[in-house]
Amino acid sequence: MLPFRTLLKWSVNRNCCRGFAVSQQNYNSVKKGLVLGVYEKEKEEESLTLTNAGDAVDNAVLGKLRDQLARSGPSLKKGKSRIFYGLHEDFPSIVVVGLGKKSAGVNQHELWNEAKENIRAAVSVGCRQMQDMEIVQVEVDPCGDAQAAAEGAVLGLFEYNEMKKKKKKAVTTHLHGSSEITAWEKGVLYAEGQNLARHLMEAPANYITPTKFAETFEQRLANMGSNVKVFTRSKQWIEEQQMGAFLSVAKGSEEPPVFLEIHYSGSSDASQPPLVFVGKGVTFDSGGISLKPSSGMDAMRGDMGGAATVCSAITTAAKLKLPINIISLAPLCENMPNGRANKPGDVVKAKNGKTIQVDNTDAEGRLLLADALCYAHSFNPRAIVNAATLTGAMDVALGSAAAGVFTNSSWLWTHLQEASVVTGDRVWRMPLFEHYSKQVTESALADLNNIGKYSRSGGACTAAAFLKEFVTAPHWAHLDIAGVMSNKDEVPYLRKGMSGRPTRTLIEFAARLSEDKQTI
């Protein structure tokens, strides 16, 4: 993948519902905090509007919460917070966070549910404030949507600090004042899935090699039950599958390639065609012989973001027990410039027999995906969805606002787009015109060229057109997630660093597909 951004950090925080992680005796003995929501006034003359949980707390303290909010300054704006001490005997510290307007909902211009996004952002602010005060047990107001509140808490507290001696205290979050435990737990699982992807992407490349990546999922899925199977395919298996494009990239590194295959059989109908996820898994991308600039190259430890998101998504689907069959495929290797590495102008053969002229060794992700997509067809899939940090051109086109989606199926696009509205992790449809296919199928030496004859124009589109040459399935989507790989401050409930996007959208997409009984 061509270079585009730099990044940073993470840490694992255990998040659950009250009573699930600690005994009641221990829970009562630790310092506790409470995060409550308040809505922004639609009109200045309106009275303060608290959430249901906020109202209950205010009643318990005889109106002191409303009184303190009124005395402390103007109405709280969206994403802003105030902290109050000594109001409630059970909670020495209470953080009140602004939820924006109560009338917020699906914003057709922004293509997300604004109310859910406001809750995620507000809760993350409150939980981080509690962490800064070293309050390790925090109860969270569901704010009208317990799933969104859980996502805000779990995503907002995540920070990669495994390599640091000094760490922030881990915070455990609990649902407060509501019976919406099922929705809360669902939100925790969605967010933990994204955090797993963030962790893998953020970890140094010498810690997350192709082998270590596969071992991570072997360990996490070992006790998930007989309907979850993990296959770690060796270099010999890859050779037997005649995945010449994938192997051509892997041969530049001393680290052996791995093809990770995860099967989740959630449907009661064993014959149900599976949804197949495919993720690019370049655990470090130096660019190969077409070497990247040294500045920012460390960020290329996250170039396996596609593999991290699809494998985390299937792991979460299994935890949620979604009634759907899913297979996740992840070709894993490094792209390095040793004496055996691909050279510009080399020709390699993919699994389907097509030859590829490799004019730029830094356009390596599409070579891995070409063979993996061919293999995906062997499962008679209901749909194929691949994710990859594929092109810097995608970052230039959309930035971090949305992942680009190239698809041959309007049915598939509708499901992906609807899922993204719910999660707030947006997608945007991009073109698969024949115009771009012509650019990759005109090659001097082979059937295909890996960068196209106009290498600087429409890079994300020509990369998608290249992948299309390895797809015969009627329902396929390619998600170019290069622009959303990392977060500076664009997503308020994610700290700076690798984002793990769009894991939650993939999970929500799978959940929605499991409910769609349409025969296709």
UniProtKB/Swiss-Prot annotation:
Q: Where does Zn(2+) 3 bind?
A: L200, M201, R301
In its UniProt record, which GO terms are filed under biological process? proteolysis
Provide the residue positions that the database annotates as binding Zn(2+) 2. Answer: K280, D285, D303, E364
Sites binding substrate sit at: K280, D285, S290, K292, D303, D362
Catalyses which reaction? Release of an N-terminal amino acid, Xaa-|-Yaa-, in which Xaa is preferably Leu, but may be other amino acids including Pro although not Arg or Lys, and Yaa may be Pro. Amino acid amides and methyl esters are also readily hydrolyzed, but rates on arylamides are exceedingly low; an S-substituted L-cysteinylglycine + H2O = an S-substituted L-cysteine + glycine; L-cysteinylglycine + H2O = L-cysteine + glycine; S-benzyl-L-cysteinylglycine + H2O = S-benzyl-L-cysteine + glycine
Q: Which residues bind Zn(2+) 1?
A: D285, D362, E364
EC category: hydrolase
Q: Does the keyword Magnesium apply?
A: yes
Sorted UniProt keywords = Aminopeptidase, Cytoplasm, Hydrolase, Magnesium, Manganese, Metal-binding, Protease, Zinc
Which cofactors is this protein said to need?
Zn(2+); Mn(2+)
Q: Which top-rank group of organisms is this from?
A: Eukaryota
GO CC terms = cytoplasm
- Subcellular localization, as worded in the UniProt entry: Cytoplasm
Q: Which GO terms describe its molecular function?
A: carboxypeptidase activity; manganese ion binding; metalloaminopeptidase activity
Question: Which coarse location class describes where this protein primarily resides?
Answer: cytoplasm
Family designation: Belongs to the peptidase M17 family.
> What is this protein's name?
Cytosol aminopeptidase
Q: Which organism is it from?
A: Xenopus tropicalis
